[in-house]
Amino acid sequence: MLYPTPIAKLIDSYSKLPGIGIKTATRLAFYTIGMSDDDVNEFAKNLLSAKRELTYCSVCGRLTDDDPCSICTDPTRDQTTILVLEDSRDVAAMENIQEYHGLYHVLHGLISPMNGISPDDINLKSLMTRLMDSEVSEVIVATNATADGEATSMYLSRLLKPAGIKVTRLARGLAVGADIEYADEVTLLRAIENRTEL
C-alpha cells in the first residue's frame, strides 16, 4: 500500500533502527502521528538532545555526558582491574549488578575476520595506551560468547600476557551466542565471580 510521503519517510527512518522491520516501523510511524504535538516535540527534543550532548569517554570509550566519564574519574574504583566490553550497553548491565568496582574499556565492536574487522578497527589502541601508563594488573575480557567474541578474547590474551598482565574472562554461565546486556543480574554476578584465566 502506498502511504503519503511524510508517513513513508517516517516509516523509512524507523526501519533503519536495528531490530525494526517494516511492520514495526509502520506501527511506530502511525503511533507517532497519533501522538499529541507536545509529545512529538518532546520526543524530537530528547532525541536531538541525546545526539548533541552524548560523547564517548576519551579514557574508556563509554557513552557518557561528561568526559572523562564519572567511572574513570571515580577515585574509589579499583584502579588495578579493567573489564573489557564490546559495547556501552554492556557497561550498564555490569554496573546494575553492583559487584564489579574496577574500571572499564569499551571496544566498540569485536574482531571479526569473516567480516573484515581487524584489531585496528576496534578501540584497542587506547586500551594499550591505558595499560602502559597505569597500575592495571588484570584485564577481564567480557565479550559475548560468539565466534567473534572468542576471537577477540584470544587476541587480547596473546597481546597482554607477554606484558605480565593477568588476562581472565567471565565464567560461562552465559549461553553461547548470548548478549551480556540481556543477561540477568545473577548470571552476570556468577560470571564475574567465577571468571577464568585465559
Swiss-Prot record:
Domain Toprim: residue ranges: 80-175
GO molecular function: DNA binding; zinc ion binding
One GO term (biological process): DNA repair
Origin superkingdom: Bacteria
Coiled coil location: none
The UniProt record lists the keyword Metal-binding: yes
Record InterPro entries: DNA_Rcmb_RecR (IPR000093), Rcmb_RecR (IPR023627), Rcmb_RecR_Znf (IPR015967), TOPRIM_dom (IPR006171), TOPRIM_RecR (IPR034137)
Keyword set includes DNA repair: yes
Keyword entries, A-Z: DNA damage, DNA recombination, DNA repair, Metal-binding, Zinc, Zinc-finger
ZnF segments: C4-type: 57-72
Pfam families: RecR_C (PF21175), RecR_HhH (PF21176), RecR_ZnF (PF02132), Toprim_4 (PF13662)
Gene3D superfamilies membership: 3.30.60.80, 3.40.1360.10, 6.10.250.240, RecR Domain 1
Function: May play a role in DNA repair. It seems to be involved in an RecBC-independent recombinational process of DNA repair. It may act with RecF and RecO.
UniProt-listed NCBIfam families: recR
Family classification: Belongs to the RecR family.
Designated name of the protein: Recombination protein RecR
Lineage: Bacteria, Bacillati, Bacillota, Bacilli, Lactobacillales
